[in-house]
Regions:
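FAD-binding FR-type
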Residues: 1-6, 19-25, 67-69, 144
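Phosphate-handling active-site elements
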Residues: 25-32
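Surface-exposed beta-strand edges and their flanking turn/coil or helix-capping segments
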Residues: 1, 9, 19, 48-50, ...
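Reductase modules of NAD(P)H-dependent flavoproteins
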Residues: 34-144
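Short, glycine-rich nucleotide/cofactor-binding loops
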Residues: 5-13
Length: 144
């Protein structure tokens, strides 16, 4: 029952949504699943309510967001940490937010199964992140 980490950005939101809905709604997984989604500003975030609903329905699912360039009109309230219920999300590139707020505190990151989908630069950074934290290549999967 390895924990599962999803990291998405940009157009990667759609395939991630499909995969996560199948995992929870169809397969009824009991694995611990965390989804981190990044965009430049709030305008680039989609399906937010869908993921928040999944989070309410399944206690083994956590959803986090990050903006790399939050705009004033976003009124983005920065989370202090992953337990902060009042903040909207984090600020920075999504892979850095995952490292700082999740992987650096994970007791066994090498046991994680990692799925990711997003723009090419993000994909490259997330793949390197997984390797840097000792996640075996067979547990790192790019979704297209």
């Amino acid at each position: 029952k390895q924990p599962v980490l999803y990291v998405g950005g940009g157009a990667g939101m759609a395939p991630m949504r499909s995969h996560l809905y199948h995992l929870f709604k169809t397969l009824k997984t009991d694995r611990k699943v965390t989804y981190w989604y990044g965009g430049r500003s709030k305008r680039e975030l989609f399906y937010i309510e869908h993921f928040k609903e999944l989070e309410r329905e399944f206690p083994n699912f956590k959803f986090y967001m990050a903006l790399s360039e939050p705009q004033e009109e976003d009124n983005w309230k920065v989370k202090k940490d992953i337990n902060d219920e009042e903040g909207d999300g984090f600020v920075g590139f999504i892979h850095n937010c995952v490292i700082d707020n999740y992987l650096n505190h994970h007791e066994a990151p090498e046991d994680i199964e990692l799925y990711f989908c997003g723009p090419p630069l993000m994909n490259k950074a997330v793949e390197k992140m997984g390797q840097d934290f000792g996640i075996p290549d067979e547990n790192i999967r790019f979704m297209s």
